[in-house]
Amino acid sequence: LGNLGFMHPLRSSGKRLLASLATGVFALSATNAAPAQPPSGTNQTWTTQQDHRNMMEQLGITKLRPGRNGSANATNNPANYDPAKANPFPNLPELLVTKDGRKVTTAEMWWKVRRPEIVEDFEREVIGRVPKNVPKVTWAITNEARDRAVTNIPVYARQLVGKVDNSAFPSIEVNIQMTVVTPLHAKQPVPLLMMFGGFGGGGFPRRPDEPEPTNRFRGFGNLTFADPPSTEQLIAAGWGYATISPNSIQADNGAGLTKGIIGLVNKGQPRKPEDWGSLRAWAWGAARGLDYLETDPTVNAKKVGIEGVSRYGKAALVTLAFEPRFAVALVASSGEGGAKLHRRNFGEAVENLTGSGEYHWMAGNFIKYGAAESKFGSRNAGDLPVDAHQLIALCAPRPTFISYGIPEKGDANWLDQQGSYMATVAAGPAFRLLGARNLGVTEDYRTAQKPPVNTGLLDGELAWRQHDGGHESRSNMKHFIAWANKLIRYTTPAPTNP
């Protein structure tokens, strides 16, 4: 599962968390305090644990509750998988009630009052703020080919680098890696799905005379799927695709927070509590990729979607919520920090995201909600001013497809498919308010039960489908394409002979 973006709680939280499990808390003491910060103009180099402790010190936190242990036989702080114990905070933050108690009854009130309130809470407490001084990105094609094919369909493929201006702090370089592939003989600009992550060679297709690799994942044998790769399904449907490398934007660890785009903007210094985390940085990078696509004559930039699986599913949801130019999203197996309700006690918990293994995804302030002891006392998921249903609602009225697989194939209960379904249901009123369609089921998230596997709720702009595959999105890709085509008003062209 690690190869697919799923990080086991014990592995993800590292040695520090393993030690803390024995006592039930993460303790900050004089012996493990963060080192002094370097002079301004010097690039800070810390370990993940040192950076994590520094943020705890900034927030005045002395002890954190440990993350849950997702192992089936765990005896130390095991994750809960009992539905009867899953809802300690049954009431979610109000979606359509303003902070001063007014009901939101019009689209204008949503856009001018309630939505900005929700955005502010997410930026301050959960995912962080994009700085105003982020430098510009200049894109250049480094490799291109018109002699490639995807499932025997000729394509135009190009690899690009988006160089971020680092003139203000030359010691940090950020070069965003992206591959763009579109049908070579398309008669008009095509819709395109941008996908976080890479596919072998970064999504760059083979020449027709090159053999297909027989083993996509080393050490796992020849994996078989019921469906072709997502890239093949997209090209066959007349779409284009792009793959964008998250790690070329921002590293997926706490030690990288003084590097990458976050470190560049901060000139090598550690984050402040409201600064952005990796999820927001990856979303920013996707938006810069869209900047390029708006200049590409083969792409219909009004019909560009965003996709991701696992942590990149979280990033895809954040991207659609905060970048209005994206038209649609496929949010796959996103779990805690994505479509899963923070307030659910099932599988992964807020405390896993506040530990040293995953805190870098979030704003520093998010760590407060795992605090056992601090200058402000203790806080938990029930103290968060927002929850996942509101993050999904920020995508409205644009088409938003929430996707999961099944535990038997590797999409573990750890992800809490039911809790994610409840969040999707609870987001429905915002879609309806804005003239879009919800899931077409009850909007009472407290009693909502997810439909059977392979039963899609795909009639509206808000969609849900749990496929019978694993920790991936390809098993839902054909359903996503058919659903998206209707909503963006695109018809797959008939095959043509060039």
How should these model regions be labeled?
Residues 107-108, 112-116, 127-191, 201:
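N-terminal cap/lid segment of alpha/beta-hydrolase-fold proteins
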Residues 190-298, 335-345:
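Cap/lid segment of the alpha/beta-hydrolase catalytic domain
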Residues 396-416, 467-469:
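Conserved strand-to-loop "acid loop" that flanks and positions the catalytic carboxylate
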Residues 219, 261, 265, 269, ...:
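Mobile cap/lid helix-loop segments that gate and shape the active-site cleft of serine hydrolases
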Residues 308-320:
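Glycine-rich nucleophile elbow surrounding the catalytic serine of serine-hydrolase chemistry
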Residues 361, 407-408, 422-498:
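C-terminal catalytic histidine-bearing segment of alpha/beta-hydrolase fold enzymes
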Residues 34-129, 492-498:
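N-terminal pre-domain segments of enzymes
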Residues 298-310:
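Alpha/beta-hydrolase fold nucleophile elbow
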